[in-house]
Amino acid sequence: RICDTAIVYTITLETNDTMKLTGFADEASRDLATQIKATKELGWTAISARMIGDRNIHEMPEADFEKAADQLDEAGIVIPELGSLIANWGKTIDSDFGIALGEIERCIPRMQRLGTKMVRVMSYAQNPWGEDQNETERFRRLREIVKRFADAGLTTVHENCMNWGGFSSEHSLRLVEEVPGLKLVFDTGNPVFQRDRSKPQADGTFPWQDAFEFWKAVREHVIHIHVKDCQNPISDDVE
């Protein structure tokens, strides 16, 4: 632990059946020097990058990014995954798609500078259940997102979170079906606090998602895993 905060660790699944450990070092600190220190204390050489200071890597001023990239190089730390803000749970499907396109434009050269091959995206925020989820537009946007990264030789992975693909394992699998080239990052903690919208009950309710069942359903499409310690919600009316 650094700064009384633990790093959430992640796993990259390699094609030769090996696993490489990395972590969300911004869970330890937003300060890059402390992120590097925390990573090295664990004996790791990789960070799953999101925030440095108060900004995501693809939103940092150019001079600040170059300084950070040099620090990482000097420390011998690599970045296998960039956790972007693209189409994340904080953006609705009716938001301007130009926002995502701008993020992609800034993200690609920074991934290339860092030698990062994998970018984490989402499928936009969940609309309240029962309302139109605008699936067609979600698929259209994600196809364009994946294509732009693929054209640069980069792999796009979708995380099951508070987004459309996080409604259930069936929703995540539908994304893979509808969006050629899309891979998955599986988060072990996110199913715990969400209802499984693929399993309506007779009384109109939905059961809590089962993380292990979710994993078994999507595993053949997963190339990266977020491992979290998580508790079930304390009340059935809290999601």
Regions found by a protein language model. Give the residues of each.
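Flexible loop residues that form catalytic
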Residues: I52, A87, Y124, G189, ...
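Acidic/histidine-rich catalytic cores of soluble enzymes
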Residues: L82, V146-E239
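Hydrophobic faces of well-ordered beta-strands that scaffold small-molecule active sites
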Residues: K20-A25, I47-A49, I79-S84, V119-V121, ...
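Alpha-helical scaffolding within the catalytic cores
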Residues: L32-Q35, A63-A68, Q209-E213
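Active-site acidic/histidine proton-transfer and metal-coordination neighborhood
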Residues: Y9, R30-A33, K37, E41, ...
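Glycine-rich, proline-tolerant flexible connector loops at the mouths of alpha/beta enzymes
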Residues: S48-A69, A125-W129
